[in-house]
């Protein structure tokens, strides 16, 4: 058991039912990658107008906050978010284990500034080791974070990602999470990637993963066929083929309570809009963010989650 003096993860992994009722169950947090190249003022202002509840801040190489500058820059972003009534309870990292450069300082600083959940870095299957070896290595690395996470009161989440990534088929991640058996290590269940990998079987994977889900990633896509080759095209929520109704229905039926991270990976600006003034660009971005936020809110209401 984790000592009572340590904060508990804010997903359903450790929440009591009484605690859940007090908190906002499904905060909508924006994965800040599309805004990383802009300044903090612009990012915060855009997200406030976009209607999100908070930030899923990139704290990683080439991110909004660089790991080596986390002690300087993360408190600044946290203060700016607070002044604008935005949560900063989530971040995206490149941390795969205790030995990742700056890992301990990033997690300590994040926890000190109110972040409760972080997405971990990835492991990949490769040609020079067998799949079982990759899974065993992932387990060892993930286990190395258990004590650090518990010490600082911050929960790690591993995102399932399409391709040759550990976690893509979900069963491999489930095996590791069951063996690790820590509330401080969770799944960031990504419906987009679950659907693209398991077109007709994703619901089975979600049901099995439900007790381990610490956060929910939402985005949409469709298929494009060019010269006989299928390629993913990322689109606004509701304009693709991802079974988002099934996803939100499952959240209700499986009693999953976790923060939502909204991933906008289709272009916030088209090429012909890149030369517009910053104000005009912001108007376009805000409108797109608002549309996706409203879509999520409509589904949360439809399935009586809020």
Map each language-model feature to its residues.
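Acidic (Asp/Glu)-rich catalytic clusters
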Residues: 20-23, 44-49, 68-88, 102-115, ...
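Histidine-acidic metal/acid-base catalytic patches
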Residues: 4-5, 17-27, 32, 38-48, ...
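Surface-exposed, active-site-proximal loop segments in enzymatic domains
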Residues: 65-70, 97-109, 122-134, 227-235, ...
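Active-site beta-loop-alpha junctions enriched in small/polar residues
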Residues: 31-35, 58-62, 93-96, 123-125, ...
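Active-site acidic/histidine proton-transfer and metal-coordination neighborhood
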Residues: 3-11, 44, 96-186, 286
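Active-site mouth loops of central-metabolism enzymes
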Residues: 26-38, 91-100, 128-135
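Glycine-rich, proline-tolerant flexible connector loops at the mouths of alpha/beta enzymes
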Residues: 56-78, 129-130
